[in-house]
Swiss-Prot record:
Species, as recorded: Candida glabrata (strain ATCC 2001 / BCRC 20586 / JCM 3761 / NBRC 0622 / NRRL Y-65 / CBS 138) (Yeast)
Keyword Ribosomal protein: no
Origin superkingdom: Eukaryota
Propeptide: 277-294
Region (Disordered): 85-246
Annotated Low complexity bias: 85-126, 144-236
Lipid attachment residues per UniProt (GPI-anchor amidated aspartate): D276
Name of this chain's protein: Protein DSE2
Topology of this chain in the membrane: Lipid-anchor; GPI-anchor
Gene name, Swiss-Prot/TrEMBL: DSE2
A biological-process GO annotation: septum digestion after cytokinesis
Protein keywords: Cell wall, Cell wall biogenesis/degradation, Glycoprotein, GPI-anchor, Lipoprotein, Membrane, Secreted, Signal
GO cellular component, one term: side of membrane
Signal peptide coordinates: 1-22
Length: 294
């Protein structure tokens, strides 16, 4: 019985020795993949295998849309009225996602102008139902907003075309009076002035052009309106958060509207005369093109 017990113990010790040696061989074989991590003075031993998944390459091109807003107003002897507001916009954008096998990532953001202008056009209808097309060839000529104001004046008795202009790099305000306004001796005059030029005429064509950084200060509103009930010797009224003064002299009602940088005074001397003014705002925003290549 003692012999069997001793033999069993020897067998157990030999088995344990073989197991320990095999384990040591395995650890020795895996020494190349072993990383030692220390924390609080304790050494931990791990066999670590790492793999990195690279993110996908994303290329996005966006062309910002250009919006043209046309607001028209009519100034007459007895009323100030707004007409329909027209907004035209167009946008083009594209995006693509492709996988990448590399783990390195390079990202850059560039600001540039769009290579192709969105085709946006609008028209201004005057009292004689003739349309003048707003030029759009320089929508994206510069990064800043371009403001081009069109002022056309006419009498209901005439049918001549009155509004034409083109968008410049710098904002240009042009005032136009019809070439013929009631040729039967009517007195229709206009004066426009700014910091650089001014002109006025009576019963003839009048034009004033000056480069400015802001739009013409015409009463612009799409929902509010105001009326002048009577033309007293001296009165005023408010429209679109602006104050307008009215004066009467020799039976003629005069309406004045102005601001700090630009003002235009139109003299309405006949009951049938009116002034159509349209302000066109062309806002071109910078195109942001983000390219992430992996």
């Amino acid at each position: 019985m003692q012999f069997r017990a001793a033999t069993l113990l020897v067998f157990i010790f030999q088995f344990l020795n073989i197991f320990i040696e095999a384990n040591q061989q395995i650890q020795k074989r895996d020494d190349d993949n072993v990383r030692y991590i220390t924390s609080d003075g304790v050494v931990y031993k791990y066999a670590i295998k790492t793999s990195t998944l690279a993110p996908a390459s994303v290329v996005v091109y966006t062309r910002y849309y250009t919006t043209t807003i046309v607001r028209e107003i009519t100034l007459a002897n007895n009323e100030v009225t707004t007409t329909t507001e027209e907004i035209t916009s167009a946008s083009v954008s594209s995006a693509s996602v492709t996988p990448s096998a590399s783990s390195s990532s390079v990202s850059e953001t560039t600001t540039s102008k769009s290579e192709s202008a969105a085709s946006v056009s609008s028209s201004i209808s005057s009292n004689n139902d003739e349309e003048s097309e707003i030029p759009d060839q320089s929508f994206l000529d510069n990064d800043s907003s371009s403001v081009s104001s069109y002022i056309s004046s006419m009498s209901p008795e005439t049918s001549s075309s009155t509004s034409s202009s083109s968008t410049m790099h710098n904002s240009t305000v042009s005032s136009f009076m019809p070439s013929s306004v009631d040729n039967s001796g009517s007195d229709f005059s206009s004066s426009s002035s700014s910091s650089s030029s001014s002109s006025s005429s009576s019963s003839s064509s009048s034009r004033s052009s000056s480069s400015m950084s802001s739009s013409i200060s015409m009463p612009i509103s799409s929902s509010s309106s105001s009326s002048i009930s009577s033309c007293s010797s001296s009165s005023s009224f408010d429209f679109d958060n602006k104050s307008y003064s009215i004066s009467k002299s020799d039976g003629t009602c005069y309406v004045y509207y102005e601001d700090d940088e630009y003002y235009s005074t139109v003299y309405l001397t006949k009951p049938g005369q009116s002034v159509d003014a349209a302000t066109t705002i062309k806002s071109t925003k910078t195109v942001y093109k983000t390219v992430s290549a992996n």
